[in-house]
Amino acid sequence: MTSVGLAPVSGLRESSSHSVGVDRLPEEMNDMRIRDDKEIEAAIVDGNGTETGHIIVTTIGGRHGQPKQTISYMAERIVGQGSFGVVFQAKCLETGETVAIKKVLQDKRYKNRELQTMRLLDHPNVVCLKHCFFSTTEKDEVYLNLVLEYVPETVHRVIKHYNKLNQRMPLILVKLYTYQIFRALSYIHHTIGVCHRDIKPQNLLVNPHTHQVKLCDFGSAKVLVKGEPNISYICSRYYRAPELIFGATEYTTAIDIWSAGCVLAELLLGQPLFPGESGVDQLVEIIKVLGTPTREEIKCMNPNYNEFKFPQIKAHPWHKIFHKRMPPEAVDLVSRLLQYSPNLRCTALEAVTHAFFDELRDPNTRLPNGRVLPPLFNFKAHELKGVSAENLLKLVPEHARKQCPSLGL
């Protein structure tokens, strides 16, 4: 285990010692490894390490003959807070690179599932884990700090930006954002086997210059095993699939598809499609649009749900929910995503091949500011495993095939 210090900065109380020993962590924590064995610990003794100007010094390397390297992060500002802990923006003093550090209280009895998941992820549309370290407080609490790439904006804030201007988001951005969401979901669902369980605009990061989207916050993510129960109270309101509202515990990755459908509808409308303060409110909003679910649909969502006391309401036609000038492909994709029966929803990869995204496959398409689109077709072979030859040619348009030499197209 390493021994590291906290570098005092002006305006902060200097600790009595410049080098603070880190308590030995429980054995199960010692087993945790991330890509490239970059596991680090740091001791924090002055406050919680997230105040502006606070400096955290950590050591990486030292394994397999690698030289030890000191990395110092200066906390700049808090960018997110919740029941999980805190996310703060920080700057690496050695390189000048800006990062996001997610700091969560670590229960010593368990491995951290978010860290275990993030170790597996490597995709252009998923936020990248750079490394991690543990920190301890004076109260002997252990915190896990995930050092992540910093992406300055969220889809949520982009929606708010256009609402303030009283404008609809340009359709090219709607296509660009949702295409990348489905690419990320296809990767985590089929390559990694993980369900995110909290897809919402706040968890979709956007680079405002390139419009590249990255899925973040894997704090609720889980590998779903058939036959094993899961908690139904996950996913944020407005984006919760109906089977979760019905209390299903044997759900599938189709809950993420429903959430992504809600995000797409919100980008098109400028407001949530199914607002509701409670599960019942939410269900009422869904029924107003999709109509009352049939007995068969309820059985598909939760076989144990026998109460059937809903008012009989007819489905509201999708073309009446959206503006009459809305492209029919957009309406068609929303209708394929927002199905009561989880097994009738299209998969993430099927969504990526949908005609709604054909404009993105046109080599002449540009961003509203005239710039080229971010990389959209840099697939790796494992992402397209089992894809038919016909769909393969659709997924990787001719002009982009040199981006994927390993696919042999």
Curated annotation (Swiss-Prot):
Residues 73-357 form the Protein kinase domain. GO terms for cellular component: cytoplasm; nucleus. Residues 1-27 are annotated as: Disordered. Autophosphorylated mainly on threonine and serine residues. The keyword Membrane does not apply. Keywords: ATP-binding, Kinase, Nucleotide-binding, Phosphoprotein, Serine/threonine-protein kinase, Transferase. Its EC number is 2.7.11.1. This is Shaggy-related protein kinase NtK-1. It comes from Nicotiana tabacum (Common tobacco).
